[in-house]
Amino acid sequence: MNLADFFAKRRDQFPALQRRRNGMQSVFLDGPAGTQVPQCVINAMSEYFVRCNANHGGLFDTSVESDRWLDESHQAGADLLNAADPTTISFGQNMTSLTMSLSRALARTWKPGDEVIVTRLDHDANFRPWILAANDAGATVRIVDVHVDDCTLDLEQLKNYLNERTKLVAVGCASNSVGTINPIAEICQWVRSAGALTFVDAVHYAPHRAIDVQAFGCDFLACSAYKFFGPHLGIQWGRREILEDLLPYKLRPASDDLPGRWMTGTQSHESIVGTMAAIDYLVSIGKELGASHSRREHLETAFSAIERHESTLATDLIQAISELPDIRIWGISDPARVAERMPTISITHSKLTATEVAIQLAKSGIFVWHGNYYAVELSELLGCEPEGMVRLGIVHYNTSIELERLIAALRSLSG
């Protein structure tokens, strides 16, 4: 099957992709900051409001039906992450707020002399919460550096930091800034051998590859639905025994059972249901491509196809940008190493600021982000502050024709 044609046909399911500027369809390369949503997500959220817009735990019809949908959404989240227990899936305002909450609870177990490890490759949501928590507990923070030439983690330094005092290692599956993929399963094994816990930020990984908390061997993992074609919502998974043992900051009437003890206040039920719809949109890709039976198997089939399609687009884009004057690709720029990175390509122009490049692309109907994307430590390390970089984010609904328009627009910058 021609995957380019297969995914091009799916564009019709995304109403926003029909947007036009200057008589041409807009090109959405802003996915790393938030993807567009398919019609099925819009329908699910609207249907929730119509059918069962009620609070949790009531004995009347709409509340009972609402709770059923929420339970189904927890199962969908478990299938997405390959978690064995749906009650270990928590929903929240966003990944940042969930991480802040968890960091507060973990900090209660730390003391002076304990150590926490973070990295300069991460989004600040997987950096600052742990710094603040460690400071409150009097714990020491170790920061893993990044190889500037290809923006990969200094894994030897990470291993050397691990010792009997290490309590937690916070690391990302993939960089939201330069696309680097980290060897998560290997890192988690090192951390586990040291007797510490691992928190994994999978936000940037989620729309591109299948997440598997069992294969990763992590203790906690968080991602965001709006990065994988859903609404603005955060998702967090943790090992059941740890989630039950920790003391979260919560209100007295709130449930002490999972998942309620980690879901502060009244949730956005419509967003939770919309997240299930986004997961089932991905499932529909797998159903169309294979003969699997379970939701998880369909997801694995879908992400296998998504990875192949996006890798082809990313390889072609990296090769084309490499031939343009005045433009630098940050991170892994060898097309032969595309398997080590996400299809997220950040660039700078030697004669124009990131802001100027983004403005010119926007005038051409090409939507990209510029700045540091909250990966503050990395942007500073690379010397890209205060302007940052221009980020070109491919997801499965992008096409080679769109990338040809992008290359033409970038070429005109040096004209």
Describe the role of every protein-language-model region.
Residues 1-415:
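Pyridoxal 5′-phosphate
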